[in-house]
Regions:
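A short, N-terminal "cap"/entry segment at the start of jelly-roll beta-barrel domains
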Residues: 1-37, 129-171
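Short acidic-glycine-tyrosine-enriched beta hairpin
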Residues: 9-10, 76-94
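Short histidine-centered beta-strand/loop micro-motifs
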Residues: 29-30, 52-57, 98-99
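Ligand-binding loop in jelly-roll beta-barrel domains
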Residues: 34, 71, 91-117
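Short, conserved beta-strand element in jelly-roll/cupin
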Residues: 40-46, 55-74, 109
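Hydrophobic small-molecule pocket/channel-lining residues, especially in calycin-type beta-barrels
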Residues: 49, 70, 78, 85, ...
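A contiguous, mid-protein "functional segment" used to position or interact
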Residues: 102-150
């Protein structure tokens, strides 16, 4: 690991990347800036965005939900996680998520930050507001995963069509 730098970023600050898996990432603290200790990014996604079942062999992944709701599958157990909720997928544990709210804003922490090269390989700099709704490019996602040691794609998302709606709250 390298030497960490002091980092201060305000809301909206940071490098913005359109991710081939869907959504726009804003890098809040890069692996280079943290001496490789971690990668921290904000992810803005829309309803229906889902990840394939996957695992990170060398990184623990923590996702804090700032706004919105996700249906999360960690090692075969499915749970809904809403605002100010968190889920942790330790390295080597299969997981996936589905956005069930209209939009969601997530804070994603990967420790250590060695997986950043995968995200950069599967992303493009944001050039316009239209990038926020650009459709996923799953072929590019698979290609980037095959070149990376940071992620293993295990299969399709484990969610059914009827799970795409937000949880109903009692009246």
């Amino acid at each position: 690991m390298g030497t960490a730098q002091a980092v201060i970023r305000q809301d909206g600050d940071g490098e913005k990347l359109w991710f081939a898996g869907g959504g726009v990432f804003t890098i809040k603290a890069s692996a280079e800036e943290t001496g490789g200790a971690f990668l921290l990014f904000e992810d803005r996604v829309v309803r229906g965005k889902t990840t394939p079942m996957h695992l990170h062999p060398n990184e623990d992944e923590t996702i804090y939900i700032l706004d919105g709701e996700l249906l999360v599958d960690i090692d075969g157990e499915q749970r809904r996680v809403g605002p100010n909720g968190v889920f942790v997928a330790p390295r080597g544990v299969p997981h996936a998520f589905l956005v069930t709210s209209e939009t969601a804003r997530l804070l994603c922490l990967q420790t250590p930050g060695s997986g950043e090269s995968f995200y950069r390989d599967a992303s493009d700099p944001v050039s316009s507001a239209a990038d926020a709704t650009r459709p996923p490019d799953l072929a590019r996602l698979r290609d980037a995963a095959e070149r990376s040691e940071a992620i293993q794609l295990l299969g399709p998302p484990p969610f059914t069509a009827d799970q795409h709606e937000p949880a109903q709250t009692p009246a």
